[in-house]
């Protein structure tokens, strides 16, 4: 059966970290937040964040506060799963690369990643975010992330990629009439 429950996904990511820790040539592993969270919850958070003003983290906090109590509880579990995986990477000295997602769910992924960096990247680099370079807004995001790291005193980790969703994103932008 191909579908895994989020807690099973978390446990599998932790097993990957445990294995990587025994292999000198595997210094990191990748995580997709969509393995921990309902896509529609990420979409809702992203939409709420886009309707708010301010920094990424201010918009994130506003969005989380705007969720129903049930959704807040669900999101709390997502954060806990991510924190457990990141904690395992920290304990085993294995980097955790948070993969990029589609633009319409990326903001909560970025916010969650910043939260994890703020916890785990104080004295060493453990958590990395992913920047899809085809996106027109990512240079500003990189600068804002650097500013957050300076202000909160954590080490900023970034993986730069072309972007796996480039064609899909371009088609969606053309259909919906926004800049790709």
Model segments located where?
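Positively charged, amphipathic and often flexible ligand-engagement surfaces
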Residues: 1-180
């Amino acid at each position: 059966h191909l579908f895994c429950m989020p807690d099973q996904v978390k446990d599998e990511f932790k097993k990957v970290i445990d294995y990587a820790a025994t292999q000198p040539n595997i210094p990191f592993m990748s995580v997709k937040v969509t393995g921990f969270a309902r896509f529609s919850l990420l979409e809702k958070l992203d939409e709420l964040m886009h309707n708010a003003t301010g920094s990424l983290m201010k918009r994130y906090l506003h969005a989380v506060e705007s969720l129903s109590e049930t959704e807040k509880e669900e999101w709390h579990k997502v954060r806990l799963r991510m924190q457990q995986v990141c904690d395992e990477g920290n304990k085993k000295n294995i980097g955790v690369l948070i993969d990029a997602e589609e633009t319409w769910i990326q903001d909560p992924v970025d916010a969650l990643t910043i939260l994890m960096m703020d916890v785990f990247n104080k004295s060493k680099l453990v958590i990395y975010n992913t920047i899809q370079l085809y996106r027109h807004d990512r240079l500003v995001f990189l600068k804002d992330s650097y500013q957050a790291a300076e202000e909160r005193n954590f080490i900023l980790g970034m993986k730069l990629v072309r972007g796996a969703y480039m064609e899909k994103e371009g088609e969606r932008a053309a259909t919906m009439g926004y800049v790709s």
